[in-house]
Amino acid sequence: MPEWNDQGIVLSAKKYGEKGLIINVLSENHGRHLGWFNNYKSKNILADVQPGNLVNVFWKSRLIEQMGKFKIELISSVSGKIFDEKLKLQALNSVCSLLEKFLPERQNYSQIFNATNAFIDLLTFQDESKNDYWMEGYVKWEIGVLSSIGFSLDLNRCAVTGSDTNLLFVSPKTGKAVSKEGAGRHAPRLLLLPSFLGGDNVIGSNFYKEILAGLNITSYFFKNKLLLSINTNKPTNLPNPRIRFVELIEKL
């Protein structure tokens, strides 16, 4: 019987029937994987399988192509560390929903696993300043996910002139940076490049506008590259937790 043991980040746990859960995890070495957990009520498992929690996962199945069953042991709980921080909780839900949406099942994405684990550590890090610079890490995490799946952005040099200065925009066609000189009359059609991604401070000093500009870049490529490649004939939209995350930032 096929089986494996691995670390995993819980993406979701959905009730199925009276006693069962279908748990979705991003494992370190076995990719995004579903598994059945039986009789969850008697085992007090719900607190352990909250989105973002790091768990030890044992998977076993009669046949490799079947969903199989999970045994779960909690390694680290996340939500309890940020339960009173609405924006961070929404960021965590956004991360899990994007991975669940875009990662194919059972393909090894150890790079994304490690990046996600590192971002969750950043998200839950407690310091006295209570600043929001973890949001920059969130945008860079999304860029890393795009790159790992096959849609890399090149933000270090102008695609038109080859210059590494005055980088103000990103081309929605190529995902490459464009300088002020290279943009010319096409500037209104380009995406703004915030300073924390190498832009020449085109957006000014408003931190949250910078974050929204970064999220606008990743939103564009998630919707117009990844979603279109998944559903070519259906309306495309990002997962609701990701949409709500942006809406919360817009209110700041």
Where are these regions (language model features)?
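Non-catalytic alpha-helical scaffolds and adjoining flexible linkers that form interface surfaces
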Residues: 1-21, 26-252
